[in-house]
Amino acid sequence: SPTGNWAALKDWAEGNEYRDLMESKLAGLRYQNTAARLPKMLARKLFMKGGRFYGSVTKLQNYRSCPYQYFLRYGIGVEERDTGEADYLDYGNYLHAGLHQFGEVLKSQNRQWRQATDEEIEKISEDITEKITPRIKADALSSDQSAKYTRRVLDQTFRRALQKFRQWSRQSGFDTVDMEKEFYLRISASPTDSFTLTGKIDRVDTDGRYAAVCDYKTGSPNLSLNEIMEGLSLQLITYLLALSKTKDTKDLLPAAMMYIYLHGRPKSISVPPNGIPHAKEKENTNGIFLNDPDVLRTLDSQSGTDDGFIGVSYVKDGSVKKTSPVLTAEQFEALKALTEKILIRLYSRLESGEIAIHPVKNGTLSPCSYCPYRSICRFDPALPENSFDYISKVSDKTIREKLDEEMKRNGKENL
């Protein structure tokens, strides 16, 4: 029979000089593209230098997106080859540094964005960019004509952001009180184990009672309740959690957590005939806000109009539209409590040595799309042992109901 013939051939090959060749060929049939759980002691050595986890919330988000990618990047330190060219990360750092330095100039003079003049925006921004340009990838933004054009786009984006900040400040009762505010958030994972999250909040605005945390973005990400609950978008809510556990800010109530868009991505902008760069204007922010029209109109007196900077709308009686991205004060508290549980769960998985090749798939988005380690992990959804971690779509309404249930369960219906 055919089976008997193959068995006889296999026995013959194993008995002579073809044995090693046959074993190497058959190994491919037995290969499983998986990553075994690391021994706990090894995991702690790789991920917890000094015996304790001390890192950013972004790291835990990255771990949630793909444990194996995290292992390669932060565990054994596999790095991408540096081309020497400025990239989107460098563009973001350029704009972040510029906005921070301009804000520090105003802060040193006890002034707000609303008080900056056109002349100051022009002159101070020029001085700042002259100082920070050489620091970007060994002056990569001055290397050739293409790089110089990129810098022109970035400089225009920087000035445009300053003008928008000034206009928003003029129609807001909130003041910017901190920029790149450092925080250290220690969380107890168990009675005998804890970890510390560190980071910098790009901007904190407050009216004395309420606080808005802001993160500058050169892209246009959307802040999603579903992604927060799935552990994929924990940055902003962790900022609010950190403020609530810091002595000088613990009494501030959440007014908003939002991304502020810095438009003008160089490689997506074509050179117009007159040689002057331009950028398509879109919405200014994206976030989740407090369901309190008085607070929101203090944050932005033009909210709900074409001149508003925050994405909320109102009905005729003045209340906030149900379709707006808002939470009640109680729901914000519940979300912070759940976020702490999510962070603990991610830390516990990491600490236990779980490094599965199991990337998330959120709609059409997956970390595999931009992962530099594809040739190492060789993830292939066609293999039976490889599969995506699919993210379920849960409506904001359902999540709000879950937050209400969480508050009742904790007996915290009232702040």
PLM regions and their residue ranges:
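Structural signature of nuclease core domains in nucleic-acid processing machines
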Residues: 1-415
